[in-house]
Amino acid sequence: GKEESGDDESFSAGLLEYPHFTRPEVFEDVPVPDVLRSGDHGRIAKWRREQSLRTTLRVRPDMLDGAPLTADDMEYLRETVEAAGRLRLGRNLHCALVHYPVFLGDRKTGATSLTNLDVHDIARCSRTYGLGSFTVVTPLKDQQTILETLVRHWTEGPGGVSNPDRAEAFSLVRMASDVQGAIDLVEARTGQRPVLLGTSARDNGVMTPQAVRDLLVDRPVLLLFGTGHGMAPEILDACDGILRPLRWMDAYNHLPVRGAVAITLDRVLGDCC
């Protein structure tokens, strides 16, 4: 056989194989596509590539992370996703930034203050990855007032007028006085109690990003991130699962919370979910 005969086998180019057709030209009411009978080798090669991309996106989207895609491939996949209205798993993922109860200095627990950059950056991450919502958890009335003012400025005020992209991100922001309130918000939105998952830099989590992705297929998930020195034990104990720490093999893994959120969302959802 020809040396190139295996070039288009499944997995050979990091993609699943395109469908094959043979005689008769119509079998069980399925005709051979016109392009394959055209004799135009360029069109045939393009059709085969697009079919491989489409099949991989539908069946094994995880393979696209390592596939050598061209700019044309990426544009085709974007158009395919938009045309199909493909369900993005991110719609079932919700995150919450917990300001109470969290560890402060000297292993005491209490409440932390809102950080403007955290709210901005996590809202933008949430919109970029297509999350269902982003809830800021704080019981402090003055902090709630600050958050309400911030959200109003970027959604209804001059901030939203001058920066529509930021307004779109801030449209996902919600507020709750405690974690139970955040759970209630997701349940009211989705009609289901979310799976509650925690995150921690300490070595008390074993759940993988793939396990979270599997849950998102048919369940809402609320992913908690702590401020200060991490969430208090009573919050983590109430979780249905805890993700294993980022950089868990290294001794130093003290990431800023907005960095941890961005990395975690990317590991769970990647480019295709």
Regions from the PLM with identified roles:
Residues 131, 193, 219, 239-240:
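Short, well-ordered alpha-helix to beta-strand connector turns
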Residues 39, 98-100, 179, 199-202, ...:
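Fold-independent oxyanion-binding glycine-rich loops
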Residues 1, 229-273:
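Structured adenosyl-cofactor binding patch, chiefly the S-adenosyl-L-methionine
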Residues 1-84:
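Non-catalytic terminal and connector segments of soluble metabolic enzymes
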Residues 28, 86-90, 189-190, 213-217, ...:
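Solvent-exposed alpha-helices and their adjacent loops that cap or buttress functional pockets
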Residues 197-235:
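Long, charge-patterned amphipathic alpha-helical coiled-coil/hairpin "stalk" segments used as oligomerization
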Residues 27, 40-43, 202-205, 228-231, ...:
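Short Gly/Pro-enriched loop/turn and capping motifs at secondary-structure junctions
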Residues 88-200, 262-273:
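RNA substrate-binding interface of SAM-dependent RNA methyltransferases
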